[in-house]
Amino acid sequence: MSALAQETNESKPVVTEGGLAEDVAKLSVSEDKPLSESWLDQMTFHVGKIKLTAKGEIPTDQWLNAFCDRADKCYDILFGGGMLAGQLKGDINNSLTTVKKQYDANKDKFVTIEQMIEIEVKARGKKDCFKDKTSACIGQLWTYRALNFLCTFMEYMVKGNLTPSQCGKQTYKDCLERYHGWLARTAVGNAMGWCPTREKIIESFLFKTQEEMAEAANRYIAVLRPLLNQVIAIM
């Protein structure tokens, strides 16, 4: 495991490891259509369409199809719209666009996420790849960080012992704080607490109870977390 992967994996909360991952992996996920109109079930359906190759790698086109123009839609739910939600949506969309541009220019070579990273690093060197804001490596790294933020937020929400505002602040601390300077950490860290009530979030996810939302969130976690673990391990 690379130093980058080790550093990032250490930031995950305990809830993402061991029992939870094993439990949610047993949940049924529909392959025919989303189980509901909720963003959680919509994302579960599309992420569930990502099928590893015979070598166990992640097809780049399936990865992009799952997340482009979809992954950003929950920020308004989690943060009630406004400037922070807009910034987070812009960040994940820019990262996905960076990956897509590199893939579109190299479809014959960048067939899987693993091949994309391996080929680019071999050609340019890891240091150069991760300094270049237009590289596939940096686009994929920040895509991972954004998706890890969303997955971790929902893992905390499932536990139910924190308010949404506490979930937001803790998730930021776990997943993104280390990558921001002091001023950004202060401003963004405080803004992460501007979340709607749990009841409002449940309603915005199109559910009536915490239990219904938790079931859908667990389905989402079940399909997404293993892919995130696989992605960061190759960075």
Task: Identify what each model region corresponds to.
Residues 1-22:
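PEST-like, low-complexity acidic/proline-rich intrinsically disordered segments
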